[in-house]
């Protein structure tokens, strides 16, 4: 199966230029292709995964991937299908983000061997280009009429009170020139990107043809949508980042575990490197079993292993199991740090707090009366163990102090997992 056929079978091609010619070229020879990543934050998020993984798929098929980090274009920001003008970031901020993203892209690709990946930065050519050269050598090849007719531009112009600045309007010229420059430097003949990049990609194809008289191609990947219509890649806490310091491996694992049945088999095709035959077999087995599908667990394991590695996957599984177990002794200090980052609602507490106060403080009970009821019915656990009276000498006027949280409840001298019922947790972080 060719790489194009594999992408098609996974539903990963939204648009492409001359797919027959592209498929024939890929079968005849090994090519160089690229995808650009503008630094809009200090980390990539799961919305970047499809193009990143597509580069990897092409490399596995023997082609040379080029990961282009937009050190120059990131200073402007892509206006494509954005409702309003982007805020401009300082050169120092963008430079820091460029380095972070370069480091994140590196593990996905192999930089050794005959088709070693290439890391590029468009600041290398735009940084030395002056305004006159840009307007004379690049600008003359772009029709303003054609640029105004691009859907992404028309939407901004037609939106009341929006409009578009010349800075953002000129963005497609910069991205278009990236293709021409990478064609000249590295022989790149294919640009891939998200479906919102079609206009920018075709601009680059046209410019490369005009400047170098070369036939080049473009391919876009689909916009990832969920069956319920909500945006993919967002949680109540915001974006799901690929940086473990921004989204913990545990939370990342949980994100994939919670994928809806209606989406999970599509996402296995989109995001994993399991074969179509393996995915079809998983789906058939799930449907035949009549019980809880295995697909979400497989998806969560594949993605966490791919992004964070085996150790992080083991930690995510250990945390997931321990939260509902009586014995939580297997949790490491690093596991608790993940929970404190984003795994559980975390609350700072001080010595002297009793379990009733802790339940109310964390929102696991709405009042002291309700909290006492939970404690009396044995529905409250501290680190997996039932909360029990441990302070027989408490003051008569403070009956709730019968169960004080103290040193025996502190894991690593800092953490306590408070649980009410089967699925309601909070993390107490001791000052």
Swiss-Prot record:
Record-annotated S4 RNA-binding domain positions: 353-422
Residues engaged in binding L-tyrosine: 34, 171, 175
What EC number is given for this enzyme?
A: 6.1.1.1
In terms of InterPro entries, this protein maps to: aa-tRNA-synth_I_CS (IPR001412), aa-tRNA-synth_Ic (IPR002305), Rossmann-like_a/b/a_fold (IPR014729), S4_RNA-bd_sf (IPR036986), SYY-like_C (IPR054608), Tyr-tRNA-ligase (IPR002307), Tyr-tRNA-ligase_bac-type (IPR024088), Tyr-tRNA-ligase_bac_1 (IPR024107)
- Motif 'KMSKS' region covers 231-235
| Classification via CDD domains | TyrRS_core
**NCBIfam families for this protein:** tyrS
Into which family does the record put it? Belongs to the class-I aminoacyl-tRNA synthetase family. TyrS type 1 subfamily.
- Function, please? Catalyzes the attachment of tyrosine to tRNA(Tyr) in a two-step reaction: tyrosine is first activated by ATP to form Tyr-AMP and then transferred to the acceptor end of tRNA(Tyr).
Protein name (database record): Tyrosine--tRNA ligase
Recorded source organism is Neisseria meningitidis serogroup B (strain ATCC BAA-335 / MC58)
Q: Which gene encodes it?
A: tyrS
């Amino acid at each position: 199966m060719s790489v194009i056929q594999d992408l098609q079978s996974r539903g990963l091609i939204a648009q492409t230029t001359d797919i027959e010619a592209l498929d024939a070229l890929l079968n005849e020879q090994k090519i160089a292709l690229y995808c650009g990543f503008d630094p809009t934050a200090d980390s990539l998020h799961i919305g970047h995964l499809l193009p990143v993984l597509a580069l990897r798929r092409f490399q596995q098929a023997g082609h040379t991937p080029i990961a282009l980090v937009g050190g120059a274009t990131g200073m402007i920001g892509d206006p494509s299908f954005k409702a309003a003008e982007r805020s401009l970031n300082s050169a120092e901020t963008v430079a820091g983000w460029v380095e972070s993203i370069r480091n994140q892209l590196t593990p996905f690709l192999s930089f050794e061997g005959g088709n070693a990946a290439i890391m590029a930065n468009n600041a290398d050519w735009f940084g030395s280009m002056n305004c006159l050269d840009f307007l004379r050598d690049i600008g003359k090849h772009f029709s303003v009429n054609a640029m105004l007719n691009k859907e992404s531009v028309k939407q901004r112009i037609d939106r009341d009170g929006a409009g578009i600045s010349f800075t953002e309007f000129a963005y497609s010229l910069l991205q278009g020139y990236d293709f021409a420059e990478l064609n000249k430097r590295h022989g790149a003949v294919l640009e891939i990107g998200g479906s919102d990049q079609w206009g920018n990609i075709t601009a680059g194809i046209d410019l490369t043809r005009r400047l170098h008289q070369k036939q080049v191609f473009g391919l876009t990947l689909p916009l990832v949508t969920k069956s319920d219509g909500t945006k993919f890649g967002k949680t109540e806490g915001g974006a799901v980042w690929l940086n473990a310091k921004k989204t913990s491996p545990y939370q990342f694992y949980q994100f994939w575990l919670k994928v809806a049945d209606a989406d999970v088999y599509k996402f296995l095709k989109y995001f994993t490197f399991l074969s179509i035959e393996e995915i079809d077999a998983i789906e058939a087995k799930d449907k035949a079993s009549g019980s809880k599908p295995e697909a979400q667990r497989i998806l969560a394991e594949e993605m966490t292993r791919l992004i964070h590695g085996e150790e992080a996957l083991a930690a995510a599984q250990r945390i997931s199991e321990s939260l509902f177990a009586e014995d939580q002794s297997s949790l490491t200090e690093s596991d608790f740090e993940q929970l404190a980052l984003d795994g559980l609602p975390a609350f700072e507490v001080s010595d002297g707090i009793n379990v009733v106060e802790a339940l109310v403080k964390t929102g696991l009970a709405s009042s002291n009366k309700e909290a006492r009821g939970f404690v009396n019915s044995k529905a409250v656990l501290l680190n997996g163990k039932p909360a029990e009276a441990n302070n027989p000498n408490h003051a008569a006027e403070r009956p709730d102090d019968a169960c004080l949280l103290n040193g025996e409840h502190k894991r690593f001298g800092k953490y306590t997992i408070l649980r009410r019922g089967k699925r309601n947790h909070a993390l107490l972080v001791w000052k």
